């Protein structure tokens, strides 16, 4: 889905630091899987097989100041992440807003050294809407630059996932098809970015093990 990283020149130790950070937070995410499982009335190790050789990616974002922000202008528009969970250390500058269940946007309180954990769309589908993907957006700052780093911890591409048995029943049938994260993400990309559909046959022939993690 993505090409290889473009590491910047002239920053000694940057690549190693990022890779270490990704490995550390991926390990943290996997250590939290029993918590998700127990919250969904599953055995603690239920999710472990789905996260062997899992797909993790990392994104850095820079939001330059916008002194005169227009209506419906965003640094990052409203959306929910696609995967299982996202780790988002709180930035020093406000801007992140989350949509609550009443349809109101709010800014989470600033907590030093805190990491926000967002649930993603694949977890929402897997849990048959028991967990809600976290809608959020970013309002750009007016005076200073804002930087953000997000790490997305997802299941492996290949395992096929169906709505969890503890989240379905006679009065609550599955709302989503049985599919792998690969198939879901391909569907998402094709529906979000229309030009992406042109690569469907090429992606179908590509060995999934060759996809950059």
Give the predicted meaning of each segment.
Residues 1-213:
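Peripheral, non-catalytic segments flanking oxidoreductase cores
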């Amino acid at each position: 889905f993505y090409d290889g990283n473009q590491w910047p020149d002239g920053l000694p130790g940057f690549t190693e630091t990022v890779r270490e950070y990704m490995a550390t937070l991926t390990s943290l995410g996997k250590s939290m899987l029993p918590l998700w499982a127990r919250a969904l009335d599953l055995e603690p190790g239920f999710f472990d097989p789905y996260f062997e050789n899992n797909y993790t990616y990392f994104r850095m974002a820079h939001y330059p100041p916008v002194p005169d922000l227009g209506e419906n202008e965003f640094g990052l528009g409203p959306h929910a992440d696609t995967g299982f969970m996202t780790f988002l250390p709180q930035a020093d500058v406000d801007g992140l807003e989350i949509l609550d269940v009443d349809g109101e946007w709010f800014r989470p309180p600033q907590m030093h050294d805190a990491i926000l954990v967002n649930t993603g769309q694949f977890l929402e589908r897997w849990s048959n809407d028991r967990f809600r993907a976290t809608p959020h957006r970013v309002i750009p700052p007016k005076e200073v630059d804002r930087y953000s780093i997000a790490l997305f911890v997802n299941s492996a591409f290949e395992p096929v996932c169906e709505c969890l048995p503890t989240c379905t029943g006679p009065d609550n049938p599955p709302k989503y098809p049985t599919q792998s994260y690969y198939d879901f993400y391909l569907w998402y990309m094709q529906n979000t970015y229309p030009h992406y559909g042109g690569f469907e046959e090429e992606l179908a022939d590509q060995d999934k093990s060759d996809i950059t993690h």
